[in-house]
Amino acid sequence: MNFITQVTISIVLYFIARISIKRSSSLYIASIIATSSYILMYLFLYQSITLLPTIHFLVTGLSLIVLFISYYEIVLLERNVRKIKLGLFENAESFPIERSYKLVFNILGVGLVFLSLALISGFAIQSIFTNNLIIKTTFTIIAWFIYLITLIGIKFLNFPIKYATRGLFISMWAVLFAYLANSYLIYN
C-alpha cells in the first residue's frame, strides 16, 4: 500500500468518525482516529524503519491529513456562518462562531507545523536536485507559503473565511500535486 492510499484511508476514517459521532468532541475523536490509523498503518506496513525517513513520511502524511481536516472544518464553518446570516440556521444561538474560528485556527497551526517538519526532514534526507524531488519540493514550498499566508491573514489581517477556504484549497492541491507528480515520475 503506497503513501497516498494510507493518507486516503485515514481521511475516510476521519469522515466516517466525524459524521457518526454526534458529540461536541467529535472533531477531536475523529482527528485522533485518523492520525493514529495513519501512524499504525505506516509502522505496520514498513518493516525496515530508519529514523529520518520514517519521521519524514509520518509528518508528511500527518500534514496532508491535517490539511484535509482544516479544509473540511473551514468549509463547514463558512457554510454555517452563511446559514446564520441568511437566518436559515435553526440553533444559531448555540453555534459558537468565535470558538469555531479559534478551533480552525489551531488546526491550521498544527498543519503548518507538520508541513514545516515535512519540508525540514525532506531537506535533511535527500538532495533536492534530482528530477522527481524538484517538483515535489517546489510545490510543497508553494503550499507552505500559501498555508502560512492564510494563517497570518486569518490571525492578524482578519481575512474573510472565503479567502482562507480558497487558500487552503490551493495549498491542499499543491501538496497533492507534488506527491502525485513525484509518484508518476518515480514509476514512469
List where the protein language model places each region.
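Juxtamembrane boundary at the C-terminal end of a transmembrane helix
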Residues: F177-N188
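Cytoplasmic-side transmembrane-helix entry/capping segments in multi-pass membrane proteins
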Residues: S24-T35, A164-I170
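Juxtamembrane inter-helical linkers in multi-pass membrane proteins
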Residues: R82-I97
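Non-cytosolic membrane-interface motifs at loop->transmembrane helix junctions
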Residues: M1-F3, I49-T60, F129-F139, Y163-G167
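Hydrophobic cores of alpha-helical transmembrane segments in multi-pass inner/ER membrane proteins
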Residues: Q6-F15, T60-V81, I142-L151
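Interfacial loop-to-transmembrane junctions
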Residues: G153-W173
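Short alpha-helical packing/oligomerization segments
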Residues: I120-I149
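Juxtamembrane "helix-exit" motif on the non-cytosolic side of transmembrane helices
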Residues: S20, L43-L51, I120-F129, Y184-I186
